[in-house]
């Protein structure tokens, strides 16, 4: 019993030291980021920094979720969906992704969720503005890895639908993919050269549909901020960026393949999210020797944890 009291004192001292270190860390991050840590939207003891500016534009803001305890082993940079006309960084904490995000936090992986310029944002230059915002967010995150005590060289880019396109556009080209270990694309499109979709869907003609549907034609022109040139189409054809040196791709699409439904109407869910897009991406990965995975091999969180080992 005589050794019990000194042991208790030592444990209390170490506990206080850890608490002080945690407080100092949070204070330093708050000072650097210009925001105050708040309650995590996922609950628990994770540390949450909301609406951090990664640039000066209206929607260049991101949220940071740091796991409780020790330094993070890596980070997932997430881009929300919404057809480039809607959506928010808070979508990362919705029920659809809740289990995945919680699993990552429980395994000491930080989560960063970014907003980006929409096609409805004043002054946008079409989809390229959103893609380049993804690059800006990634560069900002890389510059803060040491501050946030996140292991360098351990980044996964992820997104749903439109956000998956941002993740792929940045993940498949150098130097954007520096330190990126994987790309997680859910409900993904295979290219933002929309004419490439004629190779995805048999019998699909983009120009024919544009002529038949004024609404679709308006969306097309909004997407590119006007009639695109061949060079502008090439700039967003991220499927052609893929090569063997790129990080592994995880792609998961479940929508069907009937672009025109039984009522003779265009099914935008199929057009944007068909499994054919995933197949077209996997075909390119095979052709160039890029590693790829999907739901039949592993879950999204298992993929992230594997590539960040």
PLM region spans:
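Short beta-strand element of the alpha/beta-hydrolase
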Residues: 72-83
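Mobile cap/lid helix-loop segments that gate and shape the active-site cleft of serine hydrolases
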Residues: 41, 194-241, 247
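Alpha/beta-hydrolase active-site loop
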Residues: 125-146
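C-terminal motif of bacterial Sec signal peptides marking the signal peptidase cleavage site
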Residues: 12-15
């Amino acid at each position: 019993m005589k050794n019990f009291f000194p042991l208790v004192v030592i444990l209390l001292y170490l506990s206080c030291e850890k608490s002080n270190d945690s407080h100092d860390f949070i204070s330093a991050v708050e000072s650097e980021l210009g925001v105050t840590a708040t309650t995590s939207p996922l609950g628990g003891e994770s540390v949450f920094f909301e609406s951090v500016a990664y640039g000066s534009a209206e929607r260049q803001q991101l949220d940071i979720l740091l796991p409780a305890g020790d330094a993070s082993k890596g980070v997932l940079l997430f881009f929300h969906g919404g057809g480039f006309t809607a959506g928010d960084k808070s979508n990362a904490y919705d029920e659809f992704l809740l289990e995945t995000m919680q699993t990552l936090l429980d395994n000491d992986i930080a989560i960063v969720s970014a907003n980006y310029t929409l096609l409805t944002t004043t002054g946008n230059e079409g989809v390229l503005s959103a893609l380049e915002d993804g690059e800006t967010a990634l560069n900002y995150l890389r510059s803060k890895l040491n501050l946030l005590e996140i292991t360098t060289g351990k980044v996964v880019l992820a997104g749903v639908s439109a956000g998956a396109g941002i993740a792929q556009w940045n993940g498949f080209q150098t130097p954007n993919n520096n330190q990126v270990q994987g790309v997680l694309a859910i409900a993904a499109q295979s290219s933002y050269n929309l004419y490439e979709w004629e190779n995805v869907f048999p019998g699909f003609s983009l120009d024919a549909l544009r002529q038949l549907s004024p609404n679709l034609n308006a969306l097309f022109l909004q997407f590119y901020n006007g009639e695109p040139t061949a060079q502008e189409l090439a700039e967003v054809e991220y499927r052609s960026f893929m090569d063997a040196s790129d990080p592994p791709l995880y792609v998961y699409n479940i929508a069907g393949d009937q672009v025109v439904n039984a009522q003779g109407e265009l099914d935008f869910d199929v057009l944007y999210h068909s499994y054919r897009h995933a197949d077209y991406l996997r075909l390119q990965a095979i052709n160039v020797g890029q590693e790829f995975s999907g739901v039949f091999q592993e879950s999204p969180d298992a993929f992230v944890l594997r590539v960040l080992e």
